[in-house]
Amino acid sequence: MTIKVIIAGFKGKMGSTAVEMVKGDAALSLAALVDPFATETEVDGVPVFKTKEEVASLEADVWVDFTTPKFTYENTRFALENGFAPVVGTTGFTPEEIEELTALSAEKGLGGLIAPNFAIGAILLMQFAAQAAKYFPNLEIIELHHDKKKDAPSGTAVKTAELISQVRQSQTQGAADEEELIAGARGAAFDGFRIHSVRLPGLVAHQEVIFGAQGEGLTIRHDSYDRISFMGGVNLGIKEVVKRSQLVYGLEHLL
């Protein structure tokens, strides 16, 4: 029996890549495609809709969301309230929103996944960085993305910082009398260390965590050169959420 999937934001680069991934997996099938910019009514026999409300009564198992931070919270609530297990790759959730959605999913008995990053290598980077932070508490995070990305820092950088903060000896880095000659030059402050965001054309998704200590340094880096790198994680997420009864934040919980 195939898992029936709705993809929201299918006109975007991630959404369109997800469509091809689902079409190429015999265990999955497309139930519907949703995008406010859609002009067609169907794609290869799959019905297309402009609004989420039009698919509320549809028979489907999973709602895959690659829309925008502006809409993704309400979209995820909608999915849970209508019996679809959400797999969400759009970032920008607040901790309070994640807590609310987790509680709602438990109430509905539905699995779900909010993943700042679907690339397996990025998940490993986060785990390796958290391990290193126990021994190298002085660090900075640099994330680099394409120039159309709307949120900064990236969800991956925030998740990495959160994992590091759980194990790192808390301290403030830099000179005590440090002064920014240009506002923001030192990046965003997070628990005593800094996060830097780079936005340039030609990039896809990249991140490095740089650690420093007396006489040595350590750099952990991950690069996604193509959006196909995320599809293994999306595929895993779709197949795992239908087995679960509560939403999780981070792909690492499904590995």
From Swiss-Prot:
The keyword NADP is annotated on this UniProt entry: yes
Residues noted as binding (S)-2,3,4,5-tetrahydrodipicolinate in the record, renumbered to the chain: H146, G155, T156
Active-site residues (renumbered): H145, K149
Pathway(s) per entry: Amino-acid biosynthesis; L-lysine biosynthesis via DAP pathway; (S)-tetrahydrodipicolinate from L-aspartate: step 4/4
Catalytic activity: (S)-2,3,4,5-tetrahydrodipicolinate + NAD(+) + H2O = (2S,4S)-4-hydroxy-2,3,4,5-tetrahydrodipicolinate + NADH + H(+); (S)-2,3,4,5-tetrahydrodipicolinate + NADP(+) + H2O = (2S,4S)-4-hydroxy-2,3,4,5-tetrahydrodipicolinate + NADPH + H(+)
InterPro entries hit by this protein: DapB_C, DapB_N, DapB_N_CS, DHDPR_bac, NAD(P)-bd_dom_sf
Residues that bind NAD(+): G9, F10, K11, G12, K13, M14, G89, T90, T91, A115, P116, N117, F118
Listed GO MF terms: 4-hydroxy-tetrahydrodipicolinate reductase; NAD binding; NADP binding; oxidoreductase activity, acting on CH or CH2 groups, NAD or NADP as acceptor
Compartment annotation: Cytoplasm
Enzyme category, top tier: oxidoreductase
GO biological process terms held by the UniProt record: diaminopimelate biosynthetic process; lysine biosynthetic process via diaminopimelate
Pfam families linked to this entry: DapB_C (PF05173), DapB_N (PF01113)
Keyword field contains NADP: yes
Cellular component GO terms held in the UniProt record: cytosol
Catalytic activity, EC: 1.17.1.8
UniProt keywords, alphabetically: Amino-acid biosynthesis, Cytoplasm, Diaminopimelate biosynthesis, Lysine biosynthesis, NAD, NADP, Oxidoreductase
Function of the protein: Catalyzes the conversion of 4-hydroxy-tetrahydrodipicolinate (HTPA) to tetrahydrodipicolinate.
Family membership noted in the UniProt record: Belongs to the DapB family.
Protein name, as recorded: 4-hydroxy-tetrahydrodipicolinate reductase
Organism: Streptococcus suis (strain 05ZYH33)
Underlying gene: dapB
